[in-house]
């Protein structure tokens, strides 16, 4: 088993020099309730790439009708397909919201399958996240969803009512406490995790090592050139045989955590300084 975390904008100010030593796999929140990118998604994706941490994404499901379901997954795909498609293998659909319980099994099953098929048709693997209690309540038809061969990531926190903090170095709970749902390879075993370098409490996950086989070994490549010319990022890129256009720089900005790239002087200087330092990531 490998240990990892799932992250959203609720975890701020991560010291990746420290945190990356313990994190073997990360799952990042892709978009918010209004289908906009998580405020720290680009930064997190760039950090994972730089530190060689395999990562996938999750989408918390709010949709109660097909139109909203379409917009939910469209928002995730719009985020991923341009820049991040080569790094993300699994899109986990987070099925746990109380509002979904009220839909009835047939309607919720249809919505899950609709979103899952959008994910698969876009070339990603469908992941299903849910809690043991939500599963046991049969809020959706398990057999129908399992036909889509989801990668299941299940939540159960057997010790959270007894502890204030669960360091990632400590052993996971004994196997008999694992939800062990069909197709499950991941277990979110606490919401009170502690990882050196992350100030806030964080969810901790234990995954079968097979999850790593879905990710390329080379997660990032840097612009490593001894000599480049030009005092602008455009000229510098062109001098080493790369595209200096705005569209290409926008892709570079995204994978390096430079948010809302507009080609401003400040953004371009930052990009140039990363290139000079030998740590500018290629898209």
PLM-predicted stretches and their roles:
Residues 220-243:
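Extracytoplasmic/periplasm-facing segments of secreted or lipoprotein envelope proteins
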Residues 1-9, 16, 142-219:
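Functionally critical loop-and-helix segments that line ligand-binding/catalytic clefts
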Residues 38-41, 68-71, 138-142, 258, ...:
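Short secondary-structure transition/capping segments
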Residues 209-226, 279-283:
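Low-complexity, Pro/Thr/Ser/Gly/Ala-rich linker/spacer regions in secreted
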Residues 1-124:
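Substrate-binding cleft of extracellular glycoside hydrolase catalytic domains
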Residues 248-280:
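Short, Lys/Arg-enriched alpha-helical microdomains
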Residues 87-168, 173:
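Catalytic domains of cell-wall/extracellular-matrix polysaccharide-remodeling enzymes
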Residues 58-61, 86-91, 127-131, 248-249, ...:
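Surface-exposed patches in mature extracellular/periplasmic domains of secreted proteins
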């Amino acid at each position: 088993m490998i240990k990892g975390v799932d992250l959203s904008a609720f975890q701020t100010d991560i010291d990746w020099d420290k945190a990356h030593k313990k994190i073997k796999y990360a799952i990042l929140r892709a978009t918010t309730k209004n289908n906009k990118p998580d405020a720290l998604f680009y930064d997190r994706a760039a950090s994972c790439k730089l530190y060689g941490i395999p990562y996938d994404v999750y989408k918390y499901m709010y949709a109660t009708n097909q139109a909203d379901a379409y917009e939910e997954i469209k928002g995730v795909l719009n985020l991923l397909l341009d820049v991040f498609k080569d790094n993300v293998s699994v899109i986990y659909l987070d099925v746990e919201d109380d509002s979904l319980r009220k839909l009835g099994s047939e309607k919720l099953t249809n919505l899950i399958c609709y979103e899952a098929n959008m994910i698969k048709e876009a070339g990603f693997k469908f992941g299903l996240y849910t809690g043991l209690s939500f599963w046991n309540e049969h809020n959706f038809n398990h057999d129908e969803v399992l036909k889509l061969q989801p990668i299941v990531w299940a939540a159960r926190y057997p010790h959270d009512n007894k502890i204030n903090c669960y360091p990632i170095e400590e052993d996971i709970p004994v196997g008999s406490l694992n939800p062990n749902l069909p197709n499950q390879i991941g277990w979110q075993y606490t919401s009170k995790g502690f990882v050196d370098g992350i100030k806030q409490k964080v969810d901790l996950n234990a995954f079968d090592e097979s999850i790593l086989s879905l990710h390329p070994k080379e997660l990032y490549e840097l612009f490593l050139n001894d000599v480049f010319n030009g005092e602008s990022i455009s000229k510098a890129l062109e001098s080493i045989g790369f595209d200096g256009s705005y569209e290409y720089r926008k892709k570079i900005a995204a994978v390096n955590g430079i948010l809302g790239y507009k080609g401003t002087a400040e953004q371009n200087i930052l990009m140039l300084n990363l290139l000079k330092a030998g740590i500018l990531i290629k898209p």
